[in-house]
């Protein structure tokens, strides 16, 4: 009966988050611009860049490697799907498939404010005193406690929408 009611909800929350904070863009853009300036200075004017300059090929390789790293970092992200089956998430590019926690496996689930630095040591895939965290930005997360005692926090920007969804799930699961 509970599963039928969940399926009848027919509601899905999708969320994609990427490392696109303004300060990250400025940091990577600034470093990339400095390396590009050095590259162009050295290649066009022939003036070695810096007091211990790299060869022309070395500066080209440095620029290409840093640019590829910045693009890789900027495209890392967290995808979350919440539906009538449970909570599904993956951290791109490190997870090919979604990790799924079915509602039947979850003993407690709530949206809460947290301190990424104090509780988990920052953003990304992190391990802290409260278990694993998968977060990209912000300080709002879905705190999941599984029936086996495992605890997972998934960062979110859709905290209000998810809280409303969780309230619906909770009301369906209450005995009549």
Which residues are covered by each model-predicted region?
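Transmembrane-cytosolic junction motif
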Residues: 70-85, 91, 96
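Non-transmembrane, membrane-adjacent beta-strand/coil modules in membrane-associated proteins
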Residues: 4, 89-150
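Short aromatic/basic micro-patch
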Residues: 13, 81, 100, 153-156
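Single-pass alpha-helical transmembrane signal-anchor segments
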Residues: 59-75
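N-terminal membrane-targeting/pre-transmembrane regions
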Residues: 2-54, 133, 157, 161, ...
